[in-house]
């Protein structure tokens, strides 16, 4: 291995899963593991086999299916843990046993009720036992960030002598600051005589928001493995996020001494979305690298800069992580340059419209609606302001019966006519969608559906957002209500009205 290669050790399936309200199923874990393999992760920590039969089987199945990544299993410094880890891993093409014990005074005295010599003896014995199964053994000094430095140096030296090939230095509770954590790694390299016989790894938690910073500071002092998770999943405030350290290393090679990883960065975004969907853990909109706002621009000044040169406000190209869609949001903060560019993208020559007039009407619509979409802007070109927000479809009444056969009855006003339909579906939301499709005689495909709480308490409002695809174009709808089914119906009707206006625009174009 080249000295500037940073090994990426992903622990989404072990440490990340510990943050979830419920355990993942075996097939869900396998799906994530295969995605991590496709991402180019070097080491996948698949689980903690001794913790449950389900975890054992999951590690075993992942070990049998993944061929290009090393599969790792966690164990305490106990014979039964190490033996169980081996039994789960032995079918793997490449595997690692990862054993650990706490080394801080606080943990030794209050949790383990043992002194340092006892802990040292247990660690060495565990490493030797793990080495009887594989040459690839990792040892972690739990709570290393709060371990007296002389004790930590002595533990690391003896763990390497016992046969550990990777020594992991965790900031278990996210307590240290980057300069402080970097100094710990620096001292280890200066004081541990056999440090060159092992790879030094770091595992940083995010309790003070320092996980990524601590990990990067550590590689500058000699660490060559970073333990991380997709989307920063993990106990409490989470772990170092894989996408953050990988893109920091890629983006700041000038400062980070030419370090690199083998991660296929173009797969980062889809892997992030997959993990979010399987774990049911939403990605915060402002999350670095993969959040929905990470490459979004709504300020007119920022949009103007990006339109002239993306590097003015984007240090990473969205395509670098696999995002290929436009994230320029049209809001009341957008300037004329943004509106002109959007119209050009829609195929309109600037000689065919008055930009000042369109922009004035755009601002009125944006103040009323919030976010304006390209089809809304196009409607401004052909429909008068009084009519572009005129809704052909109005939801009048809605009733739903749940149970074995979910059924919805929807009444809608179309112009002056009332139309009612009743439909079944695979759940009440689909039943409502089927009713609206039948009433409108339009058959779009539902591409995205999300629910977010807008307030708290028993009378909390929920916001439903939907994306419908019709004739190759996506249309967005939003609904808000204390009743999620009603909010869903509102969102569907909103999107259907956008489709209607789009069809009306097409008619005007053909006239």
UniProtKB/Swiss-Prot annotation:
* Residues given in the record as Mn(2+) binding sites: 15, 203, 205, 239
Report the InterPro entries cross-referenced here.
Answer: 2-IPM_HCS-like, 2-isopropylmalate_synth_dimer, AIPM/Hcit_synth_CS, Aldolase_TIM, LeuA/HCS_post-cat, LeuA_allosteric_dom_sf, LeuA_bact_synth, PYR_CT
- Grouped into one coarse class, the protein's main location is cytoplasm
Sample GO molecular function, one term: manganese ion binding
| Nuclease among keywords | no
Q: What class of enzyme is it?
A: transferase
Pyruvate carboxyltransferase domain sequence ranges: 6-269
* Localization per Swiss-Prot or TrEMBL: Cytoplasm
User: Which GO cellular component terms are attached?
Assistant: cytosol
Catalyses which reaction(s): 3-methyl-2-oxobutanoate + acetyl-CoA + H2O = (2S)-2-isopropylmalate + CoA + H(+)
SMART domains referenced in this protein's UniProt entry, alphabetically? LeuA_dimer (SM00917)
Which key words are in the record? Amino-acid biosynthesis, Branched-chain amino acid biosynthesis, Cytoplasm, Leucine biosynthesis, Manganese, Metal-binding, Transferase
Q: Which Gene3D superfamilies match?
A: 1.10.238.260, 3.30.160.270, Aldolase class I
Q: Name one GO biological process term.
A: L-leucine biosynthetic process
Tell me the cofactors it needs.
Mn(2+)
Pathways involved: Amino-acid biosynthesis; L-leucine biosynthesis; L-leucine from 3-methyl-2-oxobutanoate: step 1/4
- Known EC number(s)? 2.3.3.13
Taxonomy, superkingdom: Bacteria
Write out the ranges of the annotated region (Regulatory domain). 394-511
What is the role of this chain? Catalyzes the condensation of the acetyl group of acetyl-CoA with 3-methyl-2-oxobutanoate (2-ketoisovalerate) to form 3-carboxy-3-hydroxy-4-methylpentanoate (2-isopropylmalate).
Which NCBIfam families does the entry mention?
leuA_bact, PRK00915.1-1, PRK00915.1-3
User: What family, per the record?
Assistant: Belongs to the alpha-IPM synthase/homocitrate synthase family. LeuA type 1 subfamily.
The protein's assembly and partners: Homodimer.
This one is known as 2-isopropylmalate synthase
């Amino acid at each position: 291995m080249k000295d500037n290669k940073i090994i990426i050790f992903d622990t989404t399936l072990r440490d990340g899963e510990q943050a979830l309200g419920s355990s993942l199923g075996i097939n869900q874990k396998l799906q994530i593991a295969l995605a991590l393999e496709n991402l180019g992760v070097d080491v996948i920590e698949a689980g903690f086999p001794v913790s449950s039969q389900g975890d054992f089987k999951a590690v075993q199945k992942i070990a049998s299916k993944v061929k290009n990544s090393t599969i790792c299993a966690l164990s305490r410094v106990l014979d039964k843990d190490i033996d169980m880890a081996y039994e789960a891993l032995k079918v793997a093409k490449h595997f690692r046993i990862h054993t650990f014990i706490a080394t801080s005074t606080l943990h030794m005295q209050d949790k383990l009720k043992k002194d340092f010599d006892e802990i040292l003896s247990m660690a060495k014995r565990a490493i030797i036992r793990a080495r009887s199964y594989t040459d690839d053994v990792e040892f972690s000094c739990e709570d290393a960030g709060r371990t007296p430095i002389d004790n930590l140096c002595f533990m690391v030296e003896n763990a390497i002598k016992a046969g550990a090939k990777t020594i992991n230095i965790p900031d278990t509770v996210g307590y240290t600051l980057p300069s402080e954590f970097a100094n710990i790694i620096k001292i280890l390299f200066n004081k541990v005589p056999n440090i060159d016989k092992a790879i030094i790894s770091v595992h940083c938690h995010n309790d003070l928001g320092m996980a990524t910073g601590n990990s990067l500071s550590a590689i500058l002092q000699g660490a060559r493995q970073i333990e991380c998770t997709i989307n920063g999943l993990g106990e409490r405030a989470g772990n170092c996020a894989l996408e953050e350290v990988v893109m920091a290393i890629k983006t700041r090679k000038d400062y980070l001494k030419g370090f690199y990883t083998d991660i296929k960065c173009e797969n980062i975004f889809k892997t992030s979305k997959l993990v979010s969907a399987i774990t049911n853990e939403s990605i915060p909109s402002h999350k670095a690298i993969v959040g929905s706002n990470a490459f979004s621009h709504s300020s007119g000044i920022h949009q103007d800069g990006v339109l002239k040169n993306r590097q003015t406000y984007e240090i990473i190209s969205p395509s670098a992580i696999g995002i290929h869609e436009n994230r320029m949001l049209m809001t009341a903060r957008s300037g004329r340059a943004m509106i002109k560019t959007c119209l050009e993208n829609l195929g309109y020559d600037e000689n065919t419209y008055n930009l000042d007039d369109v922009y004035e009407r755009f601002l009125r619509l944006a103040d009323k609606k919030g976010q304006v979409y390209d089809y809304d802007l196009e409607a401004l070109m052909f429909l008068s302001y009084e009519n572009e927000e005129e809704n052909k479809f109005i939801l009048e009444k809605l009733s739903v019966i749940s149970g074995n056969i979910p059924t919805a009855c929807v009444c809608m006003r179309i112009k002056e006519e009332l139309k009612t339909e009743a439909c079944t579906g695979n759940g009440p939301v689909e039943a409502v969608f089927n009713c609206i499709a039948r009433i409108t005689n339009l058959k779009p495909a539902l591409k995205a559906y999300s629910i977010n709480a807008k307030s708290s308490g028993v009378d909390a409002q929920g916001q439903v957002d939907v994306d419908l695809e019709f004739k190759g174009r996506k249309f967005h709808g939003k609904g808000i209500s204390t009743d999620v089914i009603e909010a869903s119906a509102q969102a569907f009707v909103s999107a259907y009205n956008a489709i209607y206006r789009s069809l009306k625009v097409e008619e005007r174009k053909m006239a």
